[in-house]
């Protein structure tokens, strides 16, 4: 698969041959769904907790005698049916993460890359180095490229000026190539890869 390389100003800068085994697969929605679910579950803090009937600070004394009042039978006021009582079957602190094989995770990333290539929302740029960290200038360059909602993947390290200029732009995410992931690829309309990122990905999946 051949794709044109652009500069940040929208001009042409040659072309690159993309590996069909990485960028030319038929996307499988089931793999992408499993991977996104795994990512979102793994990043949950799991610190949610409520007080059950043994935790609330209320008297354990029986409300009134068992028989003879005509009222329903009740024990302590900490029971869930009372205002101020404990929560029944509420959330507890736990780990939400679950297992997903490493080979499935790697395959899902290739399918995510292929989905962008198939939808023609994959752009390859020669480099993302800029002279200063002015956000206004970068917005103008993105306008020339037609970028308003994009994930931009740099090389092993993202240019400092580019990272600073881009972080103030809404709906623009910037990551080094080792941080590329399925969720961030799918949540943005366009995927922008540098030539260095393409080389690193092809080396990774060799």
From Swiss-Prot:
Pfam families: Ribosomal_L4 (PF00573)
Coiled-coil regions, chain positions: none
Ribonucleoprotein recorded as keyword: yes
One cellular-component annotation, GO: ribosome
HAMAP family, A to Z: Ribosomal_uL4_B
Binding partners and assembly: Part of the 50S ribosomal subunit.
SUPFAM superfamilies registered for this protein in UniProt: Ribosomal protein L4
Chain's role: One of the primary rRNA binding proteins, this protein initially binds near the 5'-end of the 23S rRNA. It is important during the early stages of 50S assembly. It makes multiple contacts with different domains of the 23S rRNA in the assembled 50S subunit and ribosome. Forms part of the polypeptide exit tunnel.
UniProt keyword terms in alphabetical order: Ribonucleoprotein, Ribosomal protein, RNA-binding, rRNA-binding
Record InterPro entries: Ribosomal_uL4, Ribosomal_uL4-like, Ribosomal_uL4_dom_sf
The protein, known as: Large ribosomal subunit protein uL4
GO BP terms: translation
Listed GO MF terms: rRNA binding; structural constituent of ribosome
UniProt similarity note: Belongs to the universal ribosomal protein uL4 family.
PANTHER family (UniProt xref): 50S RIBOSOMAL PROTEIN L4, LARGE RIBOSOMAL SUBUNIT PROTEIN UL4M
């Amino acid at each position: 698969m051949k794709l044109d390389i652009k500069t940040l100003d929208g001009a042409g800068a040659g072309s690159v041959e993309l590996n069909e085994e990485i960028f030319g697969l038929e996307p499988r929605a089931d793999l992408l769904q499993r991977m996104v679910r795994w990512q979102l579950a793994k990043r949950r803090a799991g610190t949610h907790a409520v007080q059950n009937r043994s935790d609330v600070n209320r008297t354990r004394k029986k409300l009134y005698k068992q028989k003879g009042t005509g009222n329903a039978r009740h024990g302590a006021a900490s029971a869930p049916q009372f205002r101020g009582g404990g929560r029944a079957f509420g959330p507890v602190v736990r780990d939400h993460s679950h297992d997903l094989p490493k080979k499935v995770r790697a395959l899902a990333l290739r399918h995510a890359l292929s989905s962008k290539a198939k939808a023609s929302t994959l752009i390859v740029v020669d480099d993302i180095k800029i002279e200063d960290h002015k956000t206004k200038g970068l917005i103008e360059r993105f306008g020339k490229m037609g970028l308003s909602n994009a994930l931009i993947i740099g090389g092993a390290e993202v240019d400092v000026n580019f990272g600073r200029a881009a972080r103030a732009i809404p709906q623009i995410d910037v990551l080094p190539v080792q941080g590329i992931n399925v969720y961030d690829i799918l949540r943005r309309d366009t995927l922008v890869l540098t030539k260095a990122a393409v080389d690193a990905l092809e080396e990774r999946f060799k």
